Amino acid sequence: MGNKKLISPEFRVTVGDYEISEGIEVECFSSKESHMDWCRVELSPQLQGLIQFKDMDEATVELGYEDDFDSLIDGYVRCGDGDYWKEIMIKDDMMKLDRVTIKASFVDCEPQDVIRYVLACAGIEDYILSDENYGKKDLFVIDKRSGIKTIAEVNSSWGISNPFFFQKKVFYWGTKEDQKEMYVLEEGGTILALNKYGDLWEAETIAIPWIHHSQEVEVQHSKYSGIVTVEKTIVRSDDTGAVHMYIYFAGGEQDV
């Protein structure tokens, strides 16, 4: 990836038949703890009312330069009851699980049996589940819960804490996408600032859209050095068009 892309990237938003790269301010949030990734696209007054969209229209947000873009989110428009023509709210496929209602009883079941049923009800076919043996329950009952709450209840009932989320439109439970290479975040290079707030470090970086939560990255900084797991990322633009990225990870005061 060229330095020019990293230093002065551009957002490209596709909603239905529209492709927008100007007149927008963008904020994207991704976290394995919150399950659902989202992106808010604020439209300039010139665009408000001109861009027509409806609930569940397919939408993507990409960041890059010229013809080299990486996807930040690939999901659907969520329209509420407010002035939604002023902004476009995009959420990933977890929105399907949030909107489906589960009422079912499962006999002699493993957690994977329940999750596969929930995914089928939500119309989700691409998934990778942990193949670990967590044991069976004689009876497991769900009474009118959303798909997200049902999967959370599976974790709670079996006493496990498997993260679950979507990446590149694939659902993961207790697993994650295979990582082919590890990226290095360096002081004086990709890292602009590094500070700790509570249990998490916040690394303000140049825009690196191919880094996502649950990936491992190597941090090389005078305040902290080591291999860490990304907990969440925030990418946003300001009214000048500048792009800011924040990468969060857990770690001690120093590991140098």
Regions inferred by a protein language model and the residue ranges of each:
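Surface-exposed, non-catalytic interaction/assembly patches
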Residues: 98-110, 149-152, 175-223, 240, ...
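Short beta-strand-centered interaction patches in the first periplasmic/extracellular domains
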Residues: 2, 85-94, 128-197
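Hydrophobic alpha-helical segments and helix pairs
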Residues: 84-126
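Low-complexity, intrinsically disordered Gly/Pro/Thr-rich segments
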Residues: 216, 225-238
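Assembly/oligomerization scaffold segments
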Residues: 1-95, 200, 232-243, 252, ...
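Short, charged beta-turn/beta-strand-edge "cap" motif at the junction between a beta-strand
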Residues: 63-69, 220-227
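Short beta-strands and strand-coil junctions in structured, solvent-facing domains, enriched
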Residues: 48-49, 125, 159-163, 236
